[in-house]
Amino acid sequence: VTEVMSNDRLPCTVIHNDEIIYYGCSVRLKSSQRGRSNESRVGFNIKFPSDNKFLGAHKTIAVDRSSQREIMIKHVVTRSGKIPGMYDDLAWVIQPRSNRATSGILMKSRYDDEWLENAIEDGEDGRMFEFELIYHPNNTNGGREGLKLPQPDGVVGVQMRNQGGDDKELYRWHWLIKNNRDADDYSGLINLLNTMGLSGQDYRDSIEEVVDVDQWLRSFAVQNLGGIGDNYATHGSGAWHNAIFYIRPTDGRAMYFPWDMDFTFTNGATSGVTPSTDLNKLIGIGPKYERAYYGHLLDIIETAFNAEYMGPWLRHYSDFLPSENLNGYSGYIRSRSNHVRNLIGNAVSKVSFRVTSKSGNDTDKSTIPVRGDAWVDVREIRLAGTDKGLDVRWVDDNSWEVNLPVKSGPNEYTLQGIGFGGEIIGSVKYSVTGNGSIDSAGPENLAISEIHYHPNPPSDEEVSLGFTDSSMFEWIELVNMSDSRTVDLSNVRFVNGIDFTIPSGTLLGPGKRIVIPANVAAFKQRYGNLNNGSLLNHSFLDSDGNNKLSNSGERIVLYSAANITISDFSYEDDRPWPVSADTGGYSLTLMMPGNNDPSEA
């Protein structure tokens, strides 16, 4: 057989459930050259007419007949959540040859545009690459000029590193571009590989800008739990393939999608969970990510990868796949999950959620550092009554520190350790008395007082100075509602409408106002000096002109440094909100700041 690697399609008809007939389809082989030359493994890729998609939704589907026990780890991926997983099922496939009626994994939608646009914001605009080996044939059917035979073959692999420059031709064959092929854009991938090759402080300073580290850790965790063989996630060297890397369009950071897990449950039940050199570099950044990785392992075990949960599903799948003997893997799952629990306990000592700092002290500061302990089952730390975690500094694998806001007089706090599923792991009290002259910002002393969301277009003079878009002249004003106390605005941040954090050390005097400009230079050019209030010397518009206010209205949310809601309201560009604020040169002034009522604007 010499033509097995052809991707030419042949016309076909598909009958689904002996009822629905799809005419005008086309089919090609699917698999590596090792699978395509093996009739028991070869799969199929089927394309449907644009006006008659499979189940009304899928332009193409694939049938994977190789190692169908992979359905178990795919089930774990879906059950665990927050791990990219495809729309897979099991199917009985009747091929043209009468002796080739077999089961297979039905891949209704792989990581294609259909999946991306439903799973990720602007997902179809990202760039996706399949990390693979190069397989080259070693023989022909008749000398040098003969046709190449798929077997035997040789294999060439490379690490996830820069291959000698920025020429995309160096990367094309090991990182197969899977979408937006016309753009042929390898820049995000090359940036990822450059960063992966850094070391020491350079690596630690750069990796979070290029990689969604926590997402990678969860993908690594599920594949190491599943004992996947022949896979990027589970080998220190030699398995430089079977992974998908996706460059997210919203922030340019890379995501890691599990891919081609045929060899599920291949590695021993007592094998380790940190075999990969790239994984070890990530968790070596610091205790934040080491504990996060072990926390992901624990969460996946408790959510899905345990014999109690998977047992009924193994019996269910075994009814359809009797030759796979899936029931026999219940013992593997039990042994594997117990072993990994022990590895987690050995890596990070188990402690109860608690505060170790002394409670009841006095302070003249507007914030106070508080320390405590937490095990890997704690995903974040919150103040009771809030829905966002505090900014936590992990001192070591199970010791944390947070800064709490302090106001004049007694301050009582309830700190909660929150698990991966949002459950409360533990809750502790802490108190401090404030006796300083500066209060931390909160809803009782700070408010949004004015918004200029749709300025007039730039004048010719402004355009000549580089201020080419009206959004550059947007601004938001905050007011200190206290007539006697200074407010500390450090790390107060907008989390909806715009994404912006006020720099540390920013203070606002009693009754004073501060303007946060979209662009500092543009603001000064158009509005000059402020007579009443101060101008923050930081812009919220980013260098690409994004992160701006909506001209048609949106929700604005302002949080304190402790993630307490200061302001949360929505404005519109139509009545009953004042329409003069919509490109009429006027701003939207809130007569009762923080009140989501257009009659008060």
Give the location of each predicted region.
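Conserved NTP-binding catalytic cores of kinases and kinase-like/nucleotidyltransferase enzymes
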Residues: 1-72
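Middle-to-C-terminal accessory/interaction subdomains
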Residues: 3-4, 19-25, 33-35, 39-40, ...
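Internal "kinase-insert"/substrate-recognition segments embedded within catalytic cores
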Residues: 43-53, 58-60, 65-68, 82-86, ...
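Short, solvent-exposed loop/edge segments of extracellular or virion-exposed proteins
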Residues: 354-363, 449-461
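Long, low-complexity serine/threonine/glycine- and acidic-rich segments characteristic of extracellular
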Residues: 365-367, 371-435
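Solvent-exposed beta-edge/loop recognition patches
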Residues: 420, 438-441, 456-474, 497-598
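Asparagine-centered strand-capping/turn motif at beta-strand->loop junctions
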Residues: 478-483
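Short, hydrophobic/aromatic beta-strand segments
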Residues: 484-493
